[in-house]
Amino acid sequence: MSLLFSRCNSIVTVKKDKRHMAEVNASPLKHFVTAKKKINGIFEQLGAYIQESAGFLEDTHRNTELDPVTTEEQVLDVKGYLSKVRGISEVLARRHMKVAFFGRTSNGKSTVINAMLWDKVLPSGIGHTTNCFLRVGGTDGHEAFLLTEGSEEKKSVKTVNQLAHALHQDEQLHAGSLVSVMWPNSKCPLLKDGLVLMDSPGIDVTTELDSWIDKFCLDADVFVLVANSESTLMQTEKQFFHKVSERLSRPNIFILNNRWDASASEPEYMEEVRRQHMERCTSFLVDELGVVDRAQAGDRIFFVSAKEVLSARVQKAQGMPEGGGALAEGFQVRMFEFQNFERRFEECISQSAVKTKFEQHTVRAKQIAEAVRLIMDSLHIAAQEQRVYCLEMREERQDRLRFIDKQLELLAQDYKLRIKQMTEEVERQVSTAMAEEIRRLSVLVDEYQMDFHPSPVVLKVYKNELHRHIEEGLGRNMSDRCSTAIASSLQTMQQDMIDGLKPLLPVSVRNQIDMLVPRQCFSLSYDLNCDKLCADFQEDIEFHFSLGWTMLVNRFLGPKNSRRALLGYNDQVQRPLPLTPANPSMPPLPQGSLTQEELMVSMVTGLASLTSRTSMGILVVGGVVWKAVGWRLIALSFGLYGLLYVYERLTWTTRAKERAFKRQFVEYASEKLQLIISYTGSNCSHQVQQELSGTFAHLCQQVDITRDNLEQEIAAMNKKVEALDSLQSKAKLLRNKAGWLDSELNMFIHQYLQPSR
């Protein structure tokens, strides 16, 4: 068991050691590759985030249901950020590490590049001088090609000789021209990591140094000065890098003292020459250019032989040993020096390229993310404030709605009671006034003046005009007695209703309440209809002697009983049956008992029946009276009776007939009008009730409109609050996403841009 455990531990240890060795042996150029991949991913996420934010802001700005929570300027700003991020992403996708090699003609710049690429990519050696700028980059294809400046034509190049021939045959190329040599990545692993090497003509063959710097050097991450170790640094070389230092802040410069293999022929002077070159190069970098300090200068100056390294690496690529062939003494030291240069160079260019290529864009990305975050934060705050305002407005309207419902219920009960009381009072006033007017009906009838004639035609017209006079007079008198007071009370009641319900209406409606609630001039209509009421009136304007038998009976018994007596009804007077059921607790009346009035009617009826049957009664009565009082008294009585008859007959004129007609009409009309007192009072009270109920209904209609508006506003507020909640959540999410992107950028800065301690 312990053996198995120890074996497992050893396996884990071996795996960890291998992983560590892989990390150690990994090319520093991978740092740039991973940084580029990381920053491209961040910018891709940033672009998607800004696009989402721009769409969200635009939709929010176009939402007319909400109050403005964002401005058009903010929408345009975010859209501008989107275009900037897309532009930066395109630039980052094309970014690569760039190293520029400079030096005098035939110092071995092309040989150094070939040695670093482990292959003879560029023409070099005796008879080959670079007459233009050569940009060496990698391609995923399997065939090499070159592109000349201003042309998209890919010229196939399979060998170095073909490349050299193509460069020399192109007459349009000059020292300031650029030719891109695209070499397959499969042949040069160094090019896989996005490294571009720039070869240049000798800086001692042209005076256009400024244009070279502007055109080819401003985006270079590292400059390599390839010097000839057999001579010292020339003023031309120094002048060029002084110009570079003026254009760029602290450029990364390496100095390669090439052809150091020549020192092997004079080993006794090797260290002295090396020390002199080191001092002069250090002084140039530290004192003249000020790009490094003295402690760092040793890592920027190297003594190499590019030709030896290239030869050894080509032999190794072909399967032969590195040390094969005639190599000068100290080759391994120079090989190690060149490898050390490559290591320092890769570390420097990866750090420098990440910083120069990504730092500015990273800072810009942080600024954009922060700007969008601030916009989302302001939108979140504005939406929150608007939501609080909407909640307050909704609560206010809900309170207002509850207040209206409660007040309307109380006012409805109160006005219902007051309307009932007022209608009862109106009915009482109208009934009382009508009863008084009926008692004064004779005065109104006496005021009627029109020619009277007993003929039926004239009498009919007389009746119709009298009916109209009575109706107009009663209506006028009733109006004078009741209408003004009732109308005043009604208007007061209507105004009380308006004043009571006005607080329930909006301010804008209160000022227009008189126009919204129709208030016509109220006038009571009594509708007596005297013509129909007295249509059955039958006048009796024939002459009737006051002491005649009919008048005497009528005077003592009344009109109804006199007709019964004179017309000779049955002797047996039947007692009418009661209309209501008899009370069983009371003893029943005897069948034979009669009232005094009924007994008198029965006696007179019997007497009239007796005189009508025989004339003997007259003789008997006359004889009795004759014997009792004597003939003189009887004659005198008959004489006076006759004179009275003649007087009454002579005074029975048209005027007397008119008075009799009016007296009979007053009696008849008074009786009929008494029957409709209650109806007229109820009719007037109903009119008042209808008017007041109509006014209250119109006011309630306006209140209902106000309630409906409040309910609609509350529903709109609820919808608005939901929209603001969604808006607030989305703005908060986007704000937090901006913070997350900022943390990703900070992590990138910490991991790739800040110097390691």
From Swiss-Prot:
Keywords: Apoptosis, Autophagy, Coiled coil, GTP-binding, Hydrolase, Membrane, Mitochondrion, Mitochondrion outer membrane, Nucleotide-binding, Phosphoprotein, Transmembrane, Transmembrane helix, Ubl conjugation, Unfolded protein response
Record flagged with keyword Repressor: no
UniProt GO BP: aerobic respiration; apoptotic process; blastocyst formation; camera-type eye morphogenesis; cellular response to dexamethasone stimulus; cellular response to glucose stimulus; cellular response to hypoxia; cellular response to ionizing radiation
EC number: 3.6.5.-
Localization per record: Mitochondrion outer membrane
Catalytic activity as recorded in UniProt: GTP + H2O = GDP + phosphate + H(+)
Pfam families per record: Dynamin_N, Fzo_mitofusin
Any one GO MF annotation of this record: GTPase binding
Catalytic class of the enzyme: hydrolase
Mitochondrial intermembrane side: 626
Stretches for region G2 motif: 129-130
Chain's role: Mitochondrial outer membrane GTPase that mediates mitochondrial clustering and fusion. Mitochondria are highly dynamic organelles, and their morphology is determined by the equilibrium between mitochondrial fusion and fission events. Overexpression induces the formation of mitochondrial networks. Membrane clustering requires GTPase activity and may involve a major rearrangement of the coiled coil domains. Plays a central role in mitochondrial metabolism and may be associated with obesity and/or apoptosis processes.
Name of the protein in question: Mitofusin-2
